[in-house]
Amino acid sequence: MKEQTAEKMMERTKELIRDGAFQREYTENPERDFTRQRKPGFPETVTYVPGNCRESMELNAEKFAEAAKMESVSAAALCKARAKTGWKAFREIFEECAALRPVDKLFQGYELIAVDGMKGEMPNLPLLRETYPVNSRQGYPMFHAMSAYDPLNETFLAASFQAAPADEREMAMELLDAKNVKGKKAIRLFDRGFPSVALIQKLENMGTHFVMRVTADFLTEVSGFVRSGAVDKLLRIEWDGKRQKGSKIKANLPYSFQIRCVRIRLESGEEEFLITNLPRKEFPKRKIRELYRLRWGIETGYNYLKNSVFIEEFTSKKENGIKQDFYASLWAANLTNAAIAGAMPPMIKKN
């Protein structure tokens, strides 16, 4: 039941951080680190990260010691403990908890998975500038994050964090293989920065459905559709080495496929063009329009991360700690949404 989801997430988190094998796998040096009974240990360190308040380390250390019923803990001790803890521990906790979400809401029997990215600034420090290129305009090292999000059930499912600029299409293709994303009866939703023939091929090979917004010049066939004035048409694409020559991400050749192109007119009078492999009989044009509108749920999710979880206000100055913050923020967002959903009264059906 959804009112128990937040509780299940907390219990799963406790199980993981107390598990000896989990601790050894995600401790930077298991032969040396966290071998004494000194606090904070591995469980306390992992618990600290999503619960900190983006305040000074000294104040956070004081609050943490009080909450954890420890005599005292210094900011330096917390920093050292975080350095001993690998960021992948937070990614696994986030993914394990995301898998517990109840899929209460579907779209005609399908889960919806929206894929999108965001860019942000990192602390302007020499060590980070070596790994994360500095944006000439902002003057700060930049990161590029990508996530898969269930907009109907308001849950982040998987995510990646890289230096910016990164190729969004490559990141999206990697994200499709995440354990909470692959193998599901779902419709994948993509904005116009993602479409590529290689991505379409991967989705087709996975046997999954998709809706993508494309530019008017995405493919020659799409350009022809735009000029024709048609509103919903099947297009046959023959993709060969000559056409692929300028593509950064390569599809396996030869590749022949069919896509459906749909024209959507916005209230502003502007037009958008969507490609999909959903059948017209089951998903007429109005359903395709509705599906793409639902993709905006991930924008709402990112807005929450920026303005409520403060995802860009990192509490660490090192890459390992910054990635800890990132995945801990996603975990916290999911936990908050689960708690809110569980507290809401059931909807009363109208006669």
Segments from the language model and where they lie:
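Single, function-defining residue in the core of a domain
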Residues: 1-55, 63, 72-73, 77-85, ...
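Short alpha-helical "recognition helix" segments of helix-turn-helix
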Residues: 60-67
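Short Lys/Arg-enriched helix C-cap and helix-to-coil transition segments
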Residues: 88-102
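Conserved beta-strand elements of the Class I
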Residues: 111-113
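Short secondary-structure boundary/capping segments
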Residues: 129-130
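Extracellular beta-strand-rich solenoid/capping regions of secreted or surface-exposed proteins
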Residues: 133-134
